[in-house]
């Protein structure tokens, strides 16, 4: 037996070719029931502690995420007020190392946005993001914090109070399930959701 043979050669030798053969074989290895059981095992603790799980097409799903096409997430892990309309948001994002003037501008802009009845969405980072969240909160409006990493991750750690305030006024949203590692790429994934959900 040639252990260096390609997958196409192996499938061809078995009398099958093309994508259908690969899908059929994958289905035999991982059954839909097994995947469903695994998903329920991950989601159950989250939901039992007050977390929510949104999927495309359900109430509250940000409409703009459909513009991502195949990169649209399959679920969003949420903590916060269920009444927040996640499809009526304006994104305010910027530098972590901003000037006091930039911080003031972000805060004032956020106050203006919530005055129009929309929620402010940002990424919870230091600098402009935090100023935007705080501006929305100070004006009595809703803010939605798109967080990087797995559901429940707070980064930076000293923003735990901001996460709780965002959760109380609006929502904190993660793309990945609890336990997913936080890495540099996590922020890129998060940023595409910020842009798409606000129609940027």
What are these regions (language model features)?
Residues 1-3, 53-200:
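Glycine-biased, small-residue-rich flexible motifs in mid-sequence functional cores and linkers
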Residues 1-62:
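Short, small/acidic-rich helices and loops at N termini and domain boundaries
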């Amino acid at each position: 037996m040639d252990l260096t043979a390609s997958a196409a050669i192996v499938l061809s030798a078995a009398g099958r070719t093309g994508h259908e053969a690969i899908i059929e074989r994958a289905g035999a290895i991982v059954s839909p029931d097994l995947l469903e059981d695994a998903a329920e095992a991950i989601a159950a603790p989250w939901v039992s502690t007050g977390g929510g799980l949104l999927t495309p097409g359900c109430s509250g799903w940000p409409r703009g995420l459909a513009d991502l096409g195949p990169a649209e997430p399959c679920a969003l892990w949420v903590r916060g007020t269920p009444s927040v309309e996640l499809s009526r948001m304006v994104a305010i994002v910027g530098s972590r190392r901003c000037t006091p003037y930039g911080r003031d501008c972000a805060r004032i802009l956020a106050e203006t946005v919530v005055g129009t009845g929309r929620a402010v969405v940002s990424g919870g980072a230091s600098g402009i993001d935090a100023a935007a969240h705080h501006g929305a909160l100070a004006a009595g409006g809703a803010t939605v914090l798109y967080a990087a990493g797995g559901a429940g991750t707070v980064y930076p750690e000293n923003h735990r109070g901001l996460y709780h305030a965002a959760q109380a006024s609006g929502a904190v949203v993660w793309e990945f399930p609890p336990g997913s590692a936080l890495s540099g790429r996590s922020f890129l994934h998060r940023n595409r959701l910020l842009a798409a959900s606000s129609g940027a």
